Amino acid sequence: MPRPSAGSHHSDKLHVKKGDTVVVLSGKHKGKTGKVLLALPRDQKVIVEGVNLVTKHVKPSASNPQGGIEQREGALHASKVSIVDPETGKATRIRKQIVDGKKVRVAVASGKVID
């Protein structure tokens, strides 16, 4: 098993999952909301729909004979996003609780179950 690098002091867990609606807390995309398309727990990054669009130059290939320039969502660090509270529509932290024998995520601000 490879040793973790010196700078990796995080666990492989994230507070967001694929499909969550999140808001960006900092950076040039601050305030934008979108759905999580992909969560990358080992890198502590998430890809959010419509946020942090980057330009990619794509070579022509068998599946894409035209090639060209396209816009794609880039990854954001997970600490820069927060889950949107389903009741208030604002950013909230989450807490984990056991409800009916299952561990669920609960919005701290409203107490509403998220999943």
UniProtKB/Swiss-Prot annotation:
GO molecular function: rRNA binding; structural constituent of ribosome
Keywords in alphabetical order: Ribonucleoprotein, Ribosomal protein, RNA-binding, rRNA-binding
Record-level GO BP terms: translation
Pfam families (UniProt xref): KOW, ribosomal_L24
Assigned GO CC terms: ribonucleoprotein complex; ribosome
Keyword RNA-binding: yes
Gene3D superfamilies found in the cross-reference section: 2.30.30.30
Role of this protein: One of two assembly initiator proteins, it binds directly to the 5'-end of the 23S rRNA, where it nucleates assembly of the 50S subunit. One of the proteins that surrounds the polypeptide exit tunnel on the outside of the subunit.
Family: Belongs to the universal ribosomal protein uL24 family.
Assembly and binders: Part of the 50S ribosomal subunit.
Protein name, entry field: Large ribosomal subunit protein uL24
Gene for this chain: rplX
